[in-house]
């Protein structure tokens, strides 16, 4: 096999390199290579991703509740990358949602999206619904397909800008952004004029990562993004100069803090700074 040939070549090159090395260094390199190969095999053995399986559980529970309330069986899932989007589409289609998933991104140029667009053009041929602008019409075709045929839309940030999905009352942040303004914009895709049900927001947070938990705590408790009335966070979000600045501060914590104590101290400092800024801005606007 090609992999066996590659392995033999690698071993031969390694032997040539090791000839001029101190035996202790050579042994250390061999140990590191063995460790890397072990990680490689472990990665290959991963078949079912825990996070994706938990998504199935969340969808099942929330769809069941929506059915009781009379809400549509619709879910908008946000991811940070096209790669994750493609993976989730395949995973969901292989686990009970075949033909019920539509992707929405910056290009909408995959085969399924093209097929949906062609059917949409045929359906509305000669009507004013077709604007003649391909990008806009293709987006509208996917939104219409989500409304009438699909149950799940997997969207990236750039793709979902400006679309109205008030017929969907379940939003899943599969990948959580650090920018609080981006989170509110996501929720705003569903929570807008014409929405007849409370919008349920499901957030995926790695509970084993202390920094991730503190980020969620800030977003939830200081920015009021996930509880209470939509729009109640406007005053708080308005106190920020830029959500990007907030992201930069979080990124600095992730890059520089290693221990839980360091993370705790850094987040306490950031929280204190935010409280001062928020209170001052609210005071200035009164």
Give the role of each language-model region:
Residues 1-6:
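Short, small-residue-biased leader/transition segments that mark boundaries at the very start
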Residues 47-75, 79-80, 87:
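Conserved interdomain hinge at the start of the Helicase C-terminal
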Residues 82-105:
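Conserved helicase motor "Helicase C" RecA-like lobe of SF1/SF2 P-loop NTPases
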Residues 107-156:
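Conserved helicase ATPase core of P-loop NTP-dependent helicases/translocases
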Residues 143, 154-168, 188-193:
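SF2 helicase motor core recognition
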Residues 164-175, 200-203:
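A short beta-strand element within the Helicase C-terminal
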Residues 179-197, 201:
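Conserved SF2 helicase motif VI
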Residues 197-286:
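C-terminal accessory region of SF2 helicases/translocases
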């Amino acid at each position: 096999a090609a992999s066996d040939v590659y392995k033999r070549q690698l071993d031969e090159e390694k032997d040539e390199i090791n000839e001029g090395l101190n035996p202790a260094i050579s042994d250390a390199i061999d140990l590191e290579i063995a460790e890397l190969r072990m990680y490689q095999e472990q990665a290959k053995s991963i078949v079912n991703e825990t996070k994706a399986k938990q998504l199935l559980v969340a969808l099942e529970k929330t769809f069941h509740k929506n059915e009781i309330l009379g809400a549509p069986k619709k879910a908008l899932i946000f991811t940070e990358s096209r790669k994750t989007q493609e993976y989730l589409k395949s995973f969901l289609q292989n686990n009970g949602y075949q033909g019920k998933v539509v992707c929405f991104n910056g290009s909408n140029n995959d085969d399924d999206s093209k097929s949906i667009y062609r059917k949409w053009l045929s359906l509305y041929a000669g009507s004013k619904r077709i604007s003649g602008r391909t990008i806009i019409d293709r987006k509208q075709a996917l939104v219409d397909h989500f409304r009438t045929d699909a149950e799940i839309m997997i969207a990236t940030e750039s793709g979902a800008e400006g679309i109205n999905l008030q017929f969907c009352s379940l939003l899943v942040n599969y990948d959580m952004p650090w920018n609080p303004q981006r989170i509110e914009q996501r929720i705003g895709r569903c929570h807008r004029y014409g929405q007849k049900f409370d919008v349920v927001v499901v957030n995926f947070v790695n509970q084993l990562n202390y920094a991730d938990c503190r980020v969620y705590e800030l977003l939830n408790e200081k920015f009021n993004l996930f509880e209470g009335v939509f729009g109640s966070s406007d005053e708080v979000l308005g106190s920020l100069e830029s959500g990007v600045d907030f992201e930069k501060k979080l990124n600095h914590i992730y890059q520089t803090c290693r221990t839980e104590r360091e993370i705790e101290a850094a987040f306490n400092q950031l929280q204190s700074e935010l409280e001062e800024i928020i209170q001052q801005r609210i005071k200035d606007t009164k």
